Amino acid sequence: MTPTLNSRLRLGGSLATLALSSFVVPAIAQDQAAPVTTTTPSAVDQPPVADIVVTGSLIARPNNVAVSPIVTVSSELVQQSGQITLEDSLNQLPGFTPSGNAGTGGQGAGGRATLNLRGLGSNRNLVLLDGRRLPLSDINGNVDINILPESIIGSVDVITGGASAIYGSDAMSGVVNFKTDRYFDGVRVDIQNGDSFRGDYGKFNASLALGTKFAGDRGRLMLALSYGKRDPLSGSQRDFFADKVPSSFIGTGAFVPDALNLPSQAALNGVFAQYGVTTPINRTLNLGFNNNGSLFAQTGAINYQGPTSDGYAVVGGNVRMPVGPQLQILNAFERKSAFAKGEFDLTESLTAYGQFLYVDSTVTTESGGSLTQFAPFTTIPVTNPHIPTDLRTLLASRADPTAPFRWSGRYVGIGDKGWDENYRVQQYLGGLKGTISGSWKFDAFVSYDETIHSQSMFNAVLKSRVQTLLNAADGGASLCAGGFNPFGITNATSLSQECQNYMTATVQSRERLAQTQAQGQVNGALFDLPAGPVQLALLAGYRKNTYKYDPSPDLVSNNVESVVGSNPARGEISVKEFAAQIDVPLLSDTPFFHELGVGAAFRYSDYNPTGSVKSYEFDARWQPVQALLIRGSYQRAVRAPNIGELFSPVTGSQLAIGTPPAAIGDPCDIRSTARTGINGAQVRGLCLAQGIPAAAIDAYQFATTATGGNIQGNNALTPEKANTFNVGFVFNPKFSTPWLSGFSFSVDYYNIKIRNVISTINGLTVLAKCYNLDGSNSGYSNSNEFCQLIQRDPTGQLVAIAQPYLNLGALDTDGVDVQVNWSLKLSDAGIGDGSGKIYASSAIGWLNHYKVQTLPGTASQDFVGTSTPGRPLPKWKALTTVGYSSDVFGVGLRWRYQGKLRDISAVTSPAAEQVGVKPYNLFDIFSTLDINDNLQLRGGITNLFDKGIPFVASSQNGTDPGTYDMVGRSFYVGAKFKF
């Protein structure tokens, strides 16, 4: 954290203000900029509007009734959450599952943030701005919502149901439509500061918005500038991470025996006898190096002489290096953005409009020291002068005593590896809209956007340079001062600066995505029925996306430690579309039929290269009385494979599998429940078939806690298809008694069934299914499709698990959303003579099922109520707000609730189920104070009771930073000016 930011926060901390509540409201009605209200708005309560737009429909219905379940989030709700990024505010709602965000992304995330409706994936919901697609932020079709300056947002509409027939591919789980604020005259300034109560996580945000009307109000213009900054939070700043991520890649270095060229048992016993060890040592296991040159068995910590602090520990009897303190839990983040939109009435019936968006964001991510994880592995020749005497004895006892040996370790003498990422987005849009004749209107636009992601990896250890030093007859001393001695922690940390410079480099890569869009739409009334006009909308569009990836030569040659190599890649997809929607009012203003109507929509999309698809929708609405709306819809939704799924290069990452039997680990490990269980003989046979040498099979232990996971595109993919069903009601009774006049609630049931799912297979799932931990491979056959994804080296060690994109099985989920609102004007109830009111609002989500069928014909597994890293699926989730507000002051309390969760291992490997997570509750307080008509102060405290970080057993870092609060109790203060 910079001193400047610290000083700003200390000064700002003297403001004792908190934020006015606003509401998440289910919509019977939606208008272009829904006001903050405490009740469900209805068509009767709002005056007629000439040009109504309803999110989720191509038709502007005169009665302003929304058939799709829609939740509207006001801009005030975003502000009172105390966050400086939009996704942190929206992810508090039950319908969202925390996904990638600007703080928790690792390599390649670029400070980007995505939204994930229903836990179905961030690329299965569509994110729009004023009903139009936003620039893509990555090759997987995701949209970074943090490219939107908060100062331009008037409200957010969230459709929690399929909408492919209306909006096209990607709208399987729903749509999030950000609506820009209405045009205005004047200047608006907003500033907000915040920090943790520990003073180690500063956040700052400022925005400036200018609006003007000109040429006799025929022209309207809005300009917004925004700046946001957030400090990093490392694992060393939270005690929770002190012992987390116990890595088997340790700073002392380790000798990795070759199963086909093992040291003799006699030599090994003799060396350890010198240390007073009489128990035979498993000669297939890694041996580490003490500072005095003696050896220790990493498994069992036999003869380990320390250290046992400063990042070293004995975990489960094994020597490990907890790297949790080295990890950057929340990234540093800086964003600058500019947005402009304007329109000009050329005639009374024709308006030209344009829009511009520019974003420049930078994030720095650090991930700890580099390690020797991915092939090709580092080897050391027997001629290296630094080899300790006892190790030389073992090397000489091998069948081939002159063969080089593999060295495993972590480069603790070099600074932590990290990434400086810059992410720039530009979008240009222009169009015409107007009236054709009567009720018939048109809107046509073209747009172009470009996203450039530049990445600089610093302190990248080059394998070729390390190998050159180790191969040198003098240990590399002639190449850099002192050379490289990797044996023992003291030697490893004594690396000269000259050698550090020799071994490392800054490695560059660059991604470019571009999108071109053209779309035209007409809509109007075909004819009138007694209940109202029959309306039709027609749409035609074209969209093209291109992608290009240029990696550094060191990445192409797989020359960077801890990083899987990647090749240049490029790809292109395009689509031509036609859509139609019709709305038919059947009855109105009759007994039991205040309104009855039906609608339908159809979309034809022709994708290059994956072919044509069709989607459609049928919906119905019935208001038996004015206060009650019953609604339902059925949709066939589609999602075509995106550029990343089709063309992405191999992308590798570390896949944590843990150490058996406490975790799944390598099932071939003799300590695993797979080997020790009733089917141990069958598992042993499968492990032999996979290449573990017979000489090593009965002593085989996987020495590390992680392996590689390699994701790659697949241009043979076909589109996903989904059937979605929604039914529910909204009740807004308008009781005459003041205690109930502000009461409303809604209940909606959703059911989504996706087939031909495009996805990668989780590496832990691959292991569980290959080794029949869940019954998927009862024959223990190595030809099983999951076993074919497992890669082992000639010694049998688990090198990587391939995770290509595939058309897999199915994904089925269903649940219920409930929204309850209540408010009371105190003066109406005879309490006081002021204009204040009290209110309560609760959004509740209940998840019934979340079933995943990995492959067609296989059994489904229900993950409801499980703690899946990056995708928690609680059965219950709720956001509840209570408070008081008046014309000048407001104060409230917010309760965020997430139900208990089982660990994912309860489903994937029940025999090795790990501990789950208890119910999680967070409380926030907030308030506003209006000094005058032009100045408002706000502030609040989040995580009021300083709730600690929960342990997530199956997560690589021991928790889920995207779901749980890593910071602890925090405060924010802000001010809004207008003039």
State the predicted function of each range.
Residues Q46, Y183-G186, G199, A215-R218, ...:
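Short loop/turn motifs that connect adjacent beta-strands in outer-membrane beta-barrel proteins
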Residues D88-P94, P98-R112, R132, L136-S151, ...:
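Surface-exposed beta-strand-turn/loop segments characteristic
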Residues V598, G742-S905:
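Gram-negative outer-membrane beta-barrel transporters
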Residues R755, N848-K851, W895-V907, T928-F979:
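C-terminal beta-signal and adjacent terminal beta-strands/loops
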Residues T451, F458-L462, V466, A569-G658, ...:
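Structural signature of Gram-negative outer-membrane beta-barrels, strongest in the C-terminal barrel
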